C-alpha cells in the first residue's frame, strides 16, 4: 500500500491494453483487446480490533501534489471512508498489538485498507502493519487550502504539501515547505 508522499498509487479502475496474437497457418495477426481491471473497495470487510473510520470533512476532496522534478501533478482522493481507494479503519482495541513479522497478521490484515487516526488537528494514515504514519495537517498557503505532509517520526517537520488546486500544486512544486509552519 502506498500513499501520497513520494507519489500515490491510484487504486481505481484502469484500462490496460493486452496484446494477443492469433496464429494462422502462414501469418501472425496481432490484435489488441482492452480489458478493465477494477480494484474494488470493500467497506464491509471486518478486521479484528478495527472499525470503519469516517474521515473528518476538512481532509475530504481531491488533492494534488507535484514533484519538483516533474511537470505533472499526482492526485489524492479522500472520501468519507477512503483514502486513494483504500478503505479507512480506526483501531477500537487498544490492547491489539500488530506485528509486521507475523505471518498470520500479514494474511489477516492484508487488503486494500489503511489505519487512520485524527489527533490534534492532523490526520495520521498508515498501512495496518506499517511502522510510520503519514501525517496530514490542514493549512493555507498564499490563499490556497492545502495539507502539510510529514512523517510520524517527526510530525512537526514538513516534508511536503498537497493542494486542492492542481495549478497551485504545479506552481509551488519546487517550494521548500519545510520552512512553512
Question: Where are the predicted features?
Answer:
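Long, non-globular segments of proteins
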Residues: 9, 78, 177-179
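C-terminal motif of bacterial Sec signal peptides marking the signal peptidase cleavage site
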Residues: 4-7
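Edge beta-strand at a domain terminus
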Residues: 36-48, 148-181
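Intrinsically disordered, low-complexity segments enriched in Ser/Pro/Gly/Ala and basic residues
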Residues: 18-25, 30-33, 101, 117, ...
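Short, solvent-exposed loop/hinge segments that bridge or flank secondary-structure elements
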Residues: 47-53, 60-90
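N-terminal, intrinsically disordered, polar/charged segments of Gram-positive cell-envelope systems
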Residues: 12-61
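Contiguous, well-ordered beta-strand patches that form the walls/edges
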Residues: 69-75, 88-161, 181
Amino acid at each position: 500500500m502506498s500513499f501520497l508522499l513520494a507519489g500515490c498509487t491510484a487504486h481505481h479502475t484502469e484500462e490496460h491494453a493486452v496484446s494477443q496474437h492469433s496464429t494462422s497457418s502462414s501469418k501472425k495477426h496481432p490484435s489488441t483487446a482492452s480489458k478493465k481491471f477494477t480494484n474494488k473497495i470493500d467497506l464491509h470487510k471486518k478486521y479484528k480490533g478495527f472499525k470503519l473510520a469516517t474521515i473528518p470533512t476538512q481532509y475530504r476532496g481531491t488533492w494534488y501534489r507535484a514533484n519538483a522534478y516533474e511537470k505533472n501533478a499526482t492526485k489524492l482522493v479522500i472520501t468519507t471512508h477512503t483514502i486513494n481507494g483504500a478503505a479507512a479503519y480506526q483501531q477500537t482495541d487498544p490492547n491489539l498489538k500488530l506485528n509486521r513479522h507475523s505471518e498470520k497478521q500479514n494474511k489477516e490484515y492484508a487488503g486494500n485498507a489503511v489505519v487512520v487516526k485524527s489527533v490534534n488537528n492532523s490526520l495520521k494514515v498508515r498501512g495496518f502493519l506499517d511502522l510510520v504514519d503519514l501525517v496530514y495537517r490542514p493549512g493555507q498557503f498564499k490563499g490556497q487550502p492545502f495539507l502539510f505532509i510529514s512523517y510520524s517520526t517527526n510530525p512537526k517537520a514538513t516534508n511536503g504539501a498537497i493542494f486542492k488546486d492542481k495549478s497551485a500544486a504545479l506552481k509551488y512544486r519546487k517550494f521548500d515547505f519545510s520552512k512553512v509552519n
